[in-house]
Amino acid sequence: MTQQIKYKRVLLKLSGESLMGSDPFGINHDTIVQTVGEIAEVVKMGVQVGIVVGGGNIFRGVSAQAGSMDRATADYMGMMATVMNALALKDAFETLGIKARVQSALSMQQIAETYARPKAIQYLEEGKVVIFAAGTGNPFFTTDTAAALRGAEMNCDVMLKATNVDGVYTADPKKDSSATRYETITFDEALLKNLKVMDATAFALCRERKLNIVVFGIAKEGSLKRVVTGENEGTLVHC
């Protein structure tokens, strides 16, 4: 029996760190294969998937800036790191027979298309995975904000934030064993409780555009499929 799909078009935010696996930095082969396999499963179900990937496994602009590097320069270096991750994801998808396209917010014509909204939407409608690289193309904006922006531009049904924990908790579950996971929470409640779902700019954009967010753990087998079919997975942040 075909499973009912709750979200037809999604924007998946992947952190660069989620590609490291147990390695201290870089891209872990087994981890990227597992992650792409999870995404490929929902693509085959007919879900249209756009991805914004971070670059923290290779370079973190904020950390470099703290070490006296010019912040704008550091952020541009971070954007380059996201392009490297995007190319790795594209290669992994194509190994599985899933068509994927990389669109970069910075012009790099030899290795990626320059971001163009109509073309990206066309690719999604054709069943291709679209990987958005280089953040927003501007310094001082996080990849969370890029994900919110692309999610709004692509008219996505939901933004899915893949993290290393399986949702939003009352406290850090790694530090507080009594922390409990929220199944659902409103944007206003998350603000009131000062829950760090994502950075303030991204959160405000999602709230304004009424783009709901699901925070979930991508490393948990089958978690993405459960999210897109509307099962109780992760935390739904809603209007």
Curated annotation (Swiss-Prot):
One protein family per Pfam: AA_kinase
A molecular function GO annotation: ATP binding
Residues reported in the UniProt entry to bind ATP: K13, L14, S15, G16, G56, R60, T163, N164, Y169, D172
Regulation affecting activity: Inhibited by UTP.
GO biological process annotation, one example: 'de novo' CTP biosynthetic process
Pathway: Pyrimidine metabolism; CTP biosynthesis via de novo pathway; UDP from UMP (UMPK route): step 1/1
E.C. code: 2.7.4.22
Catalytic activity, reaction form: UMP + ATP = UDP + ADP
Compartments in which it is found: Cytoplasm
Residues that hold UMP according to the record: G55, D75, T136, G137, N138, P139, F140, F141, T142, T143
GO cellular component term of the entry, any: cytosol
UniProt entry keywords in alphabetical sequence: ATP-binding, Cytoplasm, Kinase, Nucleotide-binding, Pyrimidine biosynthesis, Transferase
Subunit structure: Homohexamer.
Role of this protein: Catalyzes the reversible phosphorylation of UMP to UDP.
HAMAP family documented for this protein: PyrH_B (MF_01220_B)
Family to which the UniProt record says this protein belongs: Belongs to the UMP kinase family.
Name of the protein in its database record: Uridylate kinase
Native source species: Neisseria meningitidis serogroup C / serotype 2a (strain ATCC 700532 / DSM 15464 / FAM18)
Organism lineage: Bacteria, Pseudomonadati, Pseudomonadota, Betaproteobacteria, Neisseriales
